[in-house]
């Protein structure tokens, strides 16, 4: 990907925003070239026994340009199980009007690298401002891009889901329920610490933070036919809560500061106030 940007200011004629009408001493031009690359391999295996017992295995093997060789690739497997209880002989005798009752569960590991800046495993330089160097006039300057972190890698989400779906009398009443839990670890954060001002660098991103997201969803539906008229309606309700498992932060200065401002082990979006 290549980009080129130019601009100026102090236009002599404000209604004509062309470069030629701007102050020549304020004209600037810049550009950059960027290469990105992603690769992946996806696989899935299904097994169905008599339309009653269902198993699925899947995996992703993903690679990204953002991390160094050795941390570049991640393997993320998953498995899901299903049991169609309504296909069992004993259940058909017990509840013959129940069209479908399926119990399901799944577990998967998912990787993500979207929140990370690229090439943090490399030391390097970037253009930064202009400087007057002796009698040579204005010269473009450069600065370091920051401390390198060669250990940076994917952050992972471990996702578990348990639920069921049921349908009675050809969908006259249907219910779906799912409970889920997602544990994320290795989220990007900058370590809190003080460095000497003469060091001239900032701390890099690391795989530090983690959180836990739990919740459930329920969907209730109804469909029917009256003469030549078919209709269906449904309603759903869901709730979720996110808890900060670990958040990188400065050490508390006292017990009150720790109680008031330490979010570790607490739910997100807590509101503080006086009870009335």
What are these model-predicted stretches?
Residues 1-269, 273:
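Extracellular/periplasmic, surface-exposed regions of secreted and cell-surface proteins
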